[in-house]
């Protein structure tokens, strides 16, 4: 098959669901592509693995390959997912921790109701106001069905990527917060300079070695509200987002569904509405292997839409 035909086939595989009754929630296929490329096609249900878990799994796979072929050290044993999960559940049952988490979100909600902003402007919010008969509604309807997705791939040149990384190092900010600021700037521009922008940000919850190496899916998803005034600089906005996100990280084990319920109860949101018009998940993948035995082998990664 040609490269476009193989890519179309893998795209098709990615649209196929999993049989949930007594069957694996993953697909591993060894592939051989034109041009001498060989590798793996992976499709994994998000309920059992997130992108961070996938990165660690593949890194361990490469290390095991080099261990058996070249005699290099084997990777360290990963943490036990069940033990890490039990630790999570014990923390979740701590009443003092739950109260601190709940108080943190109630404090954020005391700033007032957010407003929905969309990359297409105010049209979606206006349609939601009409459909609910609420001219002052500040939340918009979420699209539940269909769930089909698509992907637009944008490749940043290495020189520009290096500039962004240097900027982040210079100002001690993360790439995720820089991207959040870029996204909220675009949403503000599309909504007549609206300063109050809410996004949804994914948190990996992998701060400790045990949580980093245990595999599975540990992501939680929380609102990220930013109110950046027009006279603020781009860096001011990033630092504001950084401070906001640092607060959320300290409460990242709190149930996101309870956060959603707090928003709905506080502001009387109609069912299936939201304040966030976009979401960000940021898990950078390396463009080359750090393994010294594999540095001569080019690495190519392709994402497929589910």
Q: Residues of each region from the PLM?
A:
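Short amphipathic C-terminal alpha-helix that caps PH/PH-like domains
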Residues: 10, 54-65, 238-245
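Acyl activation and transfer enzymes in specialized metabolism, enriched
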Residues: 42-59, 146-192, 231, 249-253
């Amino acid at each position: 098959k040609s490269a476009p035909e193989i890519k179309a086939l893998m795209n098709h595989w990615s649209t196929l669901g999993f049989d949930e009754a007594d069957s694996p929630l993953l697909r591993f296929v060894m592939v051989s592509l034109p041009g001498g490329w060989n590798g793996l096609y992976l499709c994994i249900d998000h309920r059992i693995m997130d992108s961070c878990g996938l990165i660690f799994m593949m890194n361990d796979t490469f290390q095991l390959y080099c261990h058996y072929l070249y005699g290099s050290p084997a990777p360290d044993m990963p943490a036990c997912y069940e033990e890490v999960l039990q630790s999570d559940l014990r923390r979740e049952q701590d009443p003092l921790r739950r109260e601190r988490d709940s108080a943190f979100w109630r404090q954020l909600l005391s700033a007032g109701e957010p407003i929905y902003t969309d990359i297409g402007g105010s049209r979606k919010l206006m349609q939601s106001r009409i459909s609910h008969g609420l001219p002052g509604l500040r939340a918009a309807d979420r699209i539940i069905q269909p769930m089909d997705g698509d992907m637009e791939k944008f490749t940043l040149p290495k020189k520009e990527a290096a500039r962004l990384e240097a900027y982040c190092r210079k100002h001690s900010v993360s790439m995720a917060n820089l991207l959040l600021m870029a996204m909220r700037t675009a949403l503000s521009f599309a909504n007549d300079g609206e300063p109050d922008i809410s996004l949804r940000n994914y948190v990996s919850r992998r701060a400790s070695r045990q949580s980093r190496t245990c595999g599975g899916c540990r992501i939680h998803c929380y609102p990220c509200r930013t109110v950046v005034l027009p006279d603020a600089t781009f860096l001011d906005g990033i630092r504001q987002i950084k401070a906001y996100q640092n607060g959320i990280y300290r409460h990242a084990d709190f149930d996101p569904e309870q956060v959603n319920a707090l928003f709905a109860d506080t502001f009387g949101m109609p069912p299936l509405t939201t304040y966030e018009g976009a979401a960000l998940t940021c898990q950078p993948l390396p463009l080359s292997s750090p393994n010294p035995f594999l540095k001569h082998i080019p690495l190519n990664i392709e994402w497929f839409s589910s």
